[in-house]
Amino acid sequence: MRAFTIGLFRDFALRWRRIGPAALISGVLVMGILPCHAQSTTSAFTDNYADVNGVRLHYASVGQGPLILFLHGYPSFWYQWKDQMLEMSRDHLAVGLDMRGYNLSSKPTDLESYKVKTLVEDVRQFAEKVGGKNKKFVLVAHDWGATVAWVFAMHYPEMLEKLIIINGAHPFLSEREVRENAAQRYASNYIFVFNGYLAPGEKPIDETNTVEYGTRRAHTGFVDAEVKKGHYSEEDRQRWIDAWSQPGSTTGGLNYYRANHRNPPFNETHPASTIAHSWSAKEVTEGAKSVTIKVPTLVIWGMKDPALLVGHLSGLDKWVANLSVKLYPDSDHWVMLDKYEEVAHDIRKYVEGKDFPKESAYRTAAR
């Protein structure tokens, strides 16, 4: 069993190092960086803070009009959305939020502060403060931000004009996939590392080295590649270094997994079978008005996502009453980075209510 465990984690780490948008470095998953024009556009954004739900959340905004709110996932920050925000700022107040635990937002140290129900309440209070009470808004979300957005739509459908999800696991389908799909269980093994169940020889996160981590990440992999391509400027690179170097930001991001038992399900044959708690959709959606989402919803999905396999799309229409799906067959988990202009156009088109075909290919492609 020990040999199997070592081999599994070694193979998994190597596999994740090879894939384009991610690398596993010292137990931290380092994601790809948003391709964008090399000239600086940061002056277009206004930085601000909102005190909500017992924390101070940083956000960037651009434009005027009804609110469209962008939520990032792990291990990102608001800046991943800058191209989509600029597009939507032509007729919206486009806001990119630093979720709690990230970049310039508060970073509580207790795990309870990262429960999904707490994150949902962050979004509710923030949207009311920035967008106004009793005013509907559009919510765009990715990865962990998407998990929060799914649950938010179940609790507060009356607050949403539209919901746009980009490669983000639906709570109930995620639970099904890690229980029934062996490939998805294997793809989710990195979460054991995130939760502190390290592979032999793996080093735990050292928050005193965040500047070193941030600098190393930004000078290797896709950050450096995008700079060399001319999509990113040195100013863009430095923004990511600064975000990843914030004290507590590494642990803050990992606490999303730890607080919500984001583990593949317990079973006797799993190499980490001593972990008795796993993801519970029932727990994270408790108190929802309805687990069937009636808000008009667009799901954008990069089909080559190595972490969230396409099985997450199978049967999604049973949980979402008004669903449209846009597939990107050659993109991965970071489709909004790889296809930033196309995704911005998708968001624009869907928000404007233009004819957006309800693709059905995902039902066959997902299995």
Question: Where do the model's predicted regions map?
Answer:
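Catalytic active-site module of serine/aspartate enzymes centered on a nucleophile-bearing elbow/loop
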Residues: 322-367
